[in-house]
From Swiss-Prot:
The N-terminus is blocked. This is Elongation factor 1-alpha. Residues 153-156 are annotated as: G4. Residues 194-196 are annotated as: G5. It comes from Artemia salina (Brine shrimp). Residues 14-21 are annotated as: G1. It comes from the Eukaryota. It is found in: Cytoplasm. GO terms for cellular component: cytoplasm.
Length: 462
């Protein structure tokens, strides 16, 4: 085997009926982790259920159903390969918690693939004021997904089919729209596709003779190609933040017989390795890491993106919980926050939000009520310029700079320092009513916390 391919994450966005599932299913089906046996099983079931047309969306429906039932499905099913990358689809919308997942997401997407439907009237519905196309694209940009690919889907159902004029019309309109959000259209590949029939998905289609391919320009250089797969291959690989101080939000804490306390989570920045003295914020508990495991194999060191379990000494399961953050006690350790200042974008709140509003915030793995202590200013979502100082209230569509105060100890960071710990979803009435990006944090002075014997011993050894 040659050198392993780089792993990248994409998120697929777009309006409900744009054909996201079919397109995604097609990629997974053709280049992906679904083995022949599973596909045959799905096809057989599809025929029995009279879904003979089957195609690709069904693959995705099956996977989604399993994911939502909480069956830990083989994540390989959500992966596929390009010439350069292993691609993981981290979430496909349509899932009720999509927005929340995208924010607290187990991972940051490196690129968003926006699917728009070219069918008569369909594109217009998706991009209309209340269509989801706009909201998803804005969210992706706000949350730091700076690369975008646009798939103009259902080219087979334009009038006439595979119409160049329709493709150009959509390209022009979407370009204007994404430019408003902050994307540079010159760096975005627009690919006319049919996710159902497969035109321009993996191979150039002869049914669009007018289409000469896409080409993009960005400061890292130019790229061009014909298909959606080519465009995915042209994604700029992410730099994984290994050099930064460790931040590892805990997803769970287990007590394992014969081993002891094992916190589990994903390394967001930095590295973790046996022998390291870690501090858990906001509780300020410091102890030594005895071992680090991933998929039941012990590691010398874990890096950003790795989901790991690590064994800590002299700390009981009761002292740690989901939402705490592990960090290196000797390198800019994490601390609890007194309050923090954030840009908040209200997505869908039926009323008015004023000072004192206290919804639940989902930030990395933490889930804690926070008070909107002071709405300092309303601002333009795109430029960040102030439009009104100290507004009495804000409502859907507004962006504002707000000071938030957590009701219980909480560990967050500025988005510019640690992106995964600096973005949050505001949940109320069982839905995501707003999203936020943290600009600055007012940290608590750590009160004397618990330092375990193991940490003291290890500290002396150094």
């Amino acid at each position: 085997m040659g050198k392993e391919k780089i792993h990248i994450n994409i998120v697929v966005i777009g309006h409900v009926d744009s054909g996201k599932s079919t397109t995604t299913g097609h990629l997974i089906y053709k280049c992906g982790g679904i083995d022949k046996r599973t596909i045959e099983k799905f096809e057989k079931e599809a025929q029995e259920m009279g879904k003979g047309s089957f195609k690709y969306a069904w693959v995705l429906d099956k996977l989604k159903a399993e994911r939502e039932r909480g069956i830990t499905i083989d994540i390989a099913l959500w992966k596929f390969e390009t010439a350069k990358y292993y691609v993981t689809i981290i979430d496909a919308p349509g899932h009720r918690d999509f927005i929340k997942n995208m924010i607290t997401g187990t991972s940051q997407a490196d690129c968003a693939v926006l699917i728009v439907a070219a069918g008569v009237g369909e594109f217009e519905a998706g991009i209309s004021k209340n269509g989801q196309t706009r909201e998803h694209a804005l969210l992706a940009y706000t949350l730091g997904v700076k690369q975008l690919i646009v798939g103009v889907n259902k080219m087979d159902s334009t009038e006439p089919p595979f119409s160049e004029a329709r493709f150009e019309e959509i390209k022009k309109e979407v370009s204007a729209y994404i430019k408003k959000i902050g994307y540079n259209p010159a760096a975005v590949a627009f690919v006319p596709i049919s996710g159902w029939h497969g035109d321009n998905m993996l191979e150039a289609s002869d049914r669009l003779p007018w289409y000469k391919g896409w080409n993009i320009e960005r400061k890292e250089g130019k790229a061009d190609g014909k298909t959606l797969l080519d465009a995915l291959d042209a994604i700029l690989p992410p730099s994984r933040p290994t050099e930064k101080p460790l931040r590892l939000p805990l997803q769970d804490v287990y007590k394992i017989g014969g081993i002891g306390t094992v916190p589990v989570g994903r390394v967001e920045t930095g590295i973790i390795k046996p022998g390291m003295i870690v501090t858990f914020a906001p509780a300020n508990i410091t102890t030594e890491v005895k071992s680090v495991e991933m998929h039941h194999e012990s590691l010398e060191q874990a890096s950003p993106g790795d989901n790991v379990g690590f064994n800590v000494k002299n700390v009981s399961v009761k002292e740690l919980r989901r939402g705490y953050v592990a960090s290196d006690s000797k390198n800019n350790p994490a601390r609890g926050s007194q309050d923090f200042f954030a840009q908040v974008i209200v997505l869908n709140h039926p009323g008015q939000i004023s000072n004192g509003y206290t919804p639940v915030l989902d930030c990395h793995t933490a889930h804690i009520a926070c008070k909107f202590a002071e709405i300092k200013e309303k601002c333009d979502r795109r430029t960040g310029k102030t439009t009104e100082a100290e507004p009495k209230f804000i409502k859907s569509g507004d962006a504002a700079m707000i000071t938030l105060v957590p009701s219980k100890p909480l560990c967050v960071e500025a988005f510019s320092d640690f992106p995964p710990l600096g973005r949050f979803a505001v949940r109320d009435m069982r839905q995501t009513v707003a999203v936020g990006v943290i600009k600055s944090v007012n940290f608590k002075d750590p009160t004397a916390g618990k330092v375990t014997k193991a940490a003291e011993k290890a500290g002396k050894k150094k």
